[in-house]
């Protein structure tokens, strides 16, 4: 896909752009966890990439601070809601900063800017005939003496009949509804059966906006799967949106309605505008340039797929009929699973961002792993903790940093820290030629493809170093000039790889820039190699391997007490650790019959009709790739496998299966503790090499 097609704006590579980017506002009622971090890492990578292109980008967010949950939690803690949200704001900001998420402004929806904008938008909607008042029946908690907000009523979904769903939307099927439509409702505050009482509420006439929304959602503003979901909701009919709540409530009072407050989902997205308005005031920016109806600036929202309804229906309609521009695009992502399952407190996989930082320390390990999984779609991604350790150690330590660690020392010791002439080099030319493809992947949020391509280039750089073996050249005085050239070429490759990885690994890139004594890298630096005689610093360790024990400690620290659970769990079979009995030993001659080869996974895809299999296309240096069916579907997404190196049995007799011919076997580890986990060779291994 070339610039100007698909998801890429026309002239994206040359014309200067002005972008306003937002991430969804985290609710100020709890800690940031690793599921939340998927979105903030994804959006931060995209923003950093755009800034490296030389575009003007403003990246804003805020805490979502209003609603009954905030009010009740503050009451429980014996503090004011304002005190609670100030404390949580500081915690959230620290978590994002330590994960290198670089907001240009991180604000709060409990601000005067947000109050003014929410009131102004409400008045504009009312003037346009889009606000109605209706007397409704609403649930009332007879124990707490309060009307119950949607999220404090639970019951059975009226559409799919899932149990324990909230009063405004079903987390199982995504349907929105009114609380009175719930089956067998109960108060989430007191547990009491609520009673119905009449009250006057304010509604946004969303049903009158359907023609506009049908056009807007099909105009390329949404991913195809999101647009299809819109079609389902249109088919069900759009309901008018209740935008008011009764006192007591922590939020903004509706200007002409004493005792009535804006529903949190009205003023929360307006918080994007308020955060930017605060930034604009501080930095002298023109607020209207980004928000007026004819704005030429681009507006992008990154969100989770669970809040698509609010951002793809309510929000654009609110903007349209109050006189503001609509988003250029809304990017929705999927959920995070850990080890193939929903995050769980009992299993220790409901992990907070702070717990990760306390145990694993380096945020860039997780930034890299998420980048290697995200492809711009709404698919869920899995954090497999063993694969996380293996991939980071293999890719970042064994491949990427390995290039510098094996060559930079010679520059310092033998050449006074000065680089030699790079000249023409086929591998460097290949690295530079990949720039447009990598840029396209980043632009379209397909960081999995970008990372895959970058690591393939790192393999080629490592192969260059291994082929020339500077450690051997250093022993031969007549090879001094060649040694200087080889190490200088390798460090130019390392510089280019650092440039490509910089949106993902900004902290590591900054350390490399200091080591190479260069200005912050931008995309324009691809064709600007370091000149002969350029002085670099002595090489210092850039990154360490992840210790699996730190990951294990993190999981243990996040486990809730399992004593009750353990009492009813049958005894697990002991995993054998004793030496293999002598009766099953094989001779070296027997082992030599097995032809184990390094294989590159050229392609991986699902097999229609197969519950456990993936179809792999394996390159082992032959004329054509081998087709192998592997029972690893439960552990791996096909996209995450493409480009990886693994180990296969190359001389296994072909086996005819109902899905086709399987021409070998990939090796994977598993036992009662988990798996399968495919094997990955160390850096330098190439397709076709024999494992001995």
Swiss-Prot record:
Q: What region holds the tRNA-binding domain?
A: 590-692
Q: Which NCBIfam families match?
A: metG, metG_C_term, PRK00133.1
**Entry's family note:** Belongs to the class-I aminoacyl-tRNA synthetase family. MetG type 1 subfamily.
The protein's job, in short, is: Is required not only for elongation of protein synthesis but also for the initiation of all mRNA translation through initiator tRNA(fMet) aminoacylation.
Q: Which gene encodes it?
A: metG1
Organism placement in taxonomy: Bacteria, Pseudomonadati, Pseudomonadota, Betaproteobacteria, Nitrosomonadales
Q: What is its EC number?
A: 6.1.1.10
KW Protease (keyword) present: no
Q: Where is it located?
A: Cytoplasm
The molecular function terms in GO held by this entry are: ATP binding; metal ion binding; methionine-tRNA ligase activity; tRNA binding
The reaction(s) catalysed by this protein are: tRNA(Met) + L-methionine + ATP = L-methionyl-tRNA(Met) + AMP + diphosphate
- Motif 'HIGH' region per UniProt: ranges: 26-36
Protein name as annotated: Methionine--tRNA ligase
Complex formation: Homodimer.
Q: Where on this chain does ATP bind?
A: 345
Motif extent ('KMSKS' region): 342-346
Cofactors needed by this protein, per the record, are: Zn(2+)
PROSITE patterns, sorted: AA_TRNA_LIGASE_I (PS00178), TRBD (PS50886)
| UniProt binding sites for Zn(2+) | 157, 160, 170, 173
Q: Enumerate the Gene Ontology biological process terms.
A: methionyl-tRNA aminoacylation
């Amino acid at each position: 896909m070339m610039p100007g097609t698909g998801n890429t704006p026309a002239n994206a590579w040359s014309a200067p752009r002005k972008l306003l980017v937002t991430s969804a506002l985290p609710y100020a009622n709890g800690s940031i966890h690793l599921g939340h971090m998927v979105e903030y890492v994804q959006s931060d990578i995209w923003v950093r990439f755009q800034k490296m292109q030389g575009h003007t980008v403003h990246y804003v967010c805020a805490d979502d601070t209003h609603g009954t949950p905030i009010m009740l939690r503050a009451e429980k803690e014996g503090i004011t809601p304002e005190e609670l949200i100030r404390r949580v704001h500081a915690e959230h900001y620290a978590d994002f900063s330590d994960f290198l998420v670089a907001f240009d402004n991180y604000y709060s929806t409990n601000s005067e800017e947000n109050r003014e904008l929410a009131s102004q938008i409400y008045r504009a909607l009312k003037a346009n005939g889009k606000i109605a008042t209706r007397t409704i029946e609403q649930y009332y908690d007879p124990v707490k003496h309060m009307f119950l907000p949607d999220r404090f009523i639970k019951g059975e979904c009226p559409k799919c009949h899932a149990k324990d769903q909230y009063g405004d939307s079903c987390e199982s099927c995504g349907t929105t509804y009114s609380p009175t439509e719930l089956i067998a409702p109960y108060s989430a505050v007191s547990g009491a059966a609520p009673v119905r009482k009449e009250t006057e509420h304010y509604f946004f006439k969303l049903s009158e906006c359907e023609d506009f929304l049908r056009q807007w959602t099909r105009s390329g503003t949404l991913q195809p799967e999101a647009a299809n979901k819109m079609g389902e909701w249109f088919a069900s009919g759009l309901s008018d949106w209740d935008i008011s709540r009764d006192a007591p409530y922590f939020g903004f009072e509706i200007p002409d309605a004493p005792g009535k407050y804006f529903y949190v989902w009205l003023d929360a997205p307006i918080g994007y505008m308020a955060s930017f308005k605060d930034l604009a005031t501080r930095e002298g920016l023109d607020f209207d340039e980004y928000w007026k109806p004819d704005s030429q600036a681009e507006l992008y929202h990154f969100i989770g797929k669970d809040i698509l309804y609010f951002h793809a229906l309510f929000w654009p309609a609110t903007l349209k009929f109050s006189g503001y521009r609509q988003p250029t695009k809304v990017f929705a992502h999927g959920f995070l699973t850990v080890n193939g399952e929903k995050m769980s407190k009992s299993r220790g996989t409901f992990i907070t961002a702070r717990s990760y930082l306390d145990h694993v320390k380096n945020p860039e390990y997780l930034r890299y792993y998420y980048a290697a999984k995200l492809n711009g779609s709404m698919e869920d991604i899995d954090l497999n903790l063993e694969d996380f350790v293996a991939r980071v150690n293999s890719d970042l330590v064994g491949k990427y940093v390995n290039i510098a660690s094996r060559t930079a020392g010679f520059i310092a010791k033998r050449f006074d820290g000065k680089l030699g002439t790079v000249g023409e080099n086929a591998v460097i030319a290949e690295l530079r030629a990949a720039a447009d493809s990598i840029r396209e992947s980043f632009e379209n949020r397909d960081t999995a493809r970008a990372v895959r391509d970058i690591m393939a280039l790192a393999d080629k750089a490592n192969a260059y170093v291994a082929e020339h073996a500077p450690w051997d050249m250093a022993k031969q005085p007549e090879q001094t000039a060649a040694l200087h050239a080889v190490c200088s070429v390798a460090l130019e490759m390392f510089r280019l790889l650092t440039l490509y990885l910089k949106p993902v690994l900004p902290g590591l890139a900054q350390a490399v820039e200091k080591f190479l004594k260069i200005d912050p890298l931008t995309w324009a630096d691809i064709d600007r190699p370091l000149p002969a005689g350029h002085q670099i610093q002595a090489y210092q360790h850039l990154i360490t391997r992840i210790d699996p024990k730190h990951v294990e400690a993190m999981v243990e620290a996040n486990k809730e007490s399992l004593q009750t659970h353990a009492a009813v769990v049958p005894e697990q079979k002991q995993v054998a650790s004793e030496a293999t009995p002598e009766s099953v030993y094989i001779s070296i001659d027997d082992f030599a019959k097995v032809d184990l080869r390094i294989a590159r996974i050229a392609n991986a895809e699902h097999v229609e009709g197969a519950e456990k299999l993936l179809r792999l296309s394996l390159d082992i240096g032959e004329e054509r790739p081998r087709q192998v069916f592997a029972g690893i579907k439960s552990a791996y997404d096909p996209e995450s496998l493409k480009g990886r190196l693994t180990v296969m049995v190359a001389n296994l007799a072909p086996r005819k299966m109902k899905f086709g011919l399987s021409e070998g076997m990939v090796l994977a580890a598993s036992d009662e503790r988990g798996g399968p986990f495919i094997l990955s060779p160390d850096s330098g291994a190439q397709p076709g090499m024999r494992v001995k």
